[in-house]
From Swiss-Prot:
Residues annotated as signal peptide: none
CC annotations in GO: large ribosomal subunit
GO molecular function terms attached to this record: rRNA binding; structural constituent of ribosome; tRNA binding
Family: Belongs to the universal ribosomal protein uL1 family.
Name of the encoding gene: rplA
Keyword Glycoprotein part of the UniProt annotation: no
Role played: Binds directly to 23S rRNA. The L1 stalk is quite mobile in the ribosome, and is involved in E site tRNA release.
Record SUPFAM superfamilies: Ribosomal protein L1
Source organism: Thermobifida fusca (strain YX)
Protein name: Large ribosomal subunit protein uL1
Length: 235
């Protein structure tokens, strides 16, 4: 793949023979972003787990202290009083059978899905659509709940969901290039700290094998997992 001149120039600023501390990586991410819009900053991790085994699955949520820089569009499956609570909390779409039908017809203009427990029977038929996109509500991530107002508020406030893929990779958005370095660093450490907390007891050897920080269409910055672990503990 042919890279642009600006990309190649940005990539030259990154020393591939070393691993950067989290603070250095965040600074470089801001300096090497070459696009003309407010790029997204993402952290990618390679974990020492076998996700094919149920006891090594890594999945969870984290409330980023400074949000992601993007207001998530939240869809809520609820009826009656819970539906009103969801609307009052700022949900973008609220309904039940009508939303099931819209999604079956191809509607996917949302970033997160919340549901009351009684709605899960109806939502089950959407598994093939929502599941592969990481949008299926789940009690473990707080998206199947009677307290829909809190779930909506948390998501709007910067709560993100993550899940390791079948290759052991994990991707988390931690903000925008326009964030100052300290805010990006605090978001980064909050995300990593939660991933560390969720280390499966069945996982053997090194848990976090590799960390890369990237911006939209920008070069990857290798981050030191050991320095990250120490910084997360101290945060």
């Amino acid at each position: 793949m042919k890279r642009s001149k600006s990309y190649r120039k940005a990539a030259e600023q990154i020393d591939r023979t070393r691993l950067y501390t989290p603070a250095e990586a965040v600074r470089l991410a801001k300096e090497t972003s070459t696009v003309k819009f407010d790029a997204t900053v993402e952290v990618a991790m390679r974990l020492g787990v076998d996700p094919r085994k149920a006891d090594q699955m890594v999945r969870g949520t984290v409330n980023l202290p400074h949000g992601t820089g993007k207001t998530a569009r939240v869809l809520v499956f609820a009826a009656g009083e819970r539906a009103e609570q969801a609307r009052a909390a700022g949900a973008d779409y609220v309904g039940d059978d009508d939303l099931v039908e819209r999604i079956q017809q191809g509607f996917l203009d949302f970033d997160a899905v919340v549901a009351t427990p009684d709605m899960m029977g109806k939502i089950g038929r959407l598994g093939r659509i929502l599941g592969p996109r990481g949008l299926m509500p789940n009690p473990k991530t707080g998206t199947v709940t009677m307290d829909v107002a809190k779930a909506v508020s948390d998501i709007k406030g910067g709560k993100i969901e993550f899940r390791v893929d079948r290759h052991g990779n994990l991707h988390l958005i931690i903000g925008k290039v326009s964030f100052d370095e300290q805010k990006l660093l605090e978001n980064y450490l909050a995300a990593v700290d939660e991933v560390l907390r969720l280390k499966p007891s069945a996982a053997k050897g090194r848990y976090i094998k590799k960390i890369t920080l990237t911006t939209t269409m920008g070069p990857g910055i290798p981050v030191d997992p050991n320095a990250t672990r120490e910084a997360a503990k101290a945060a």
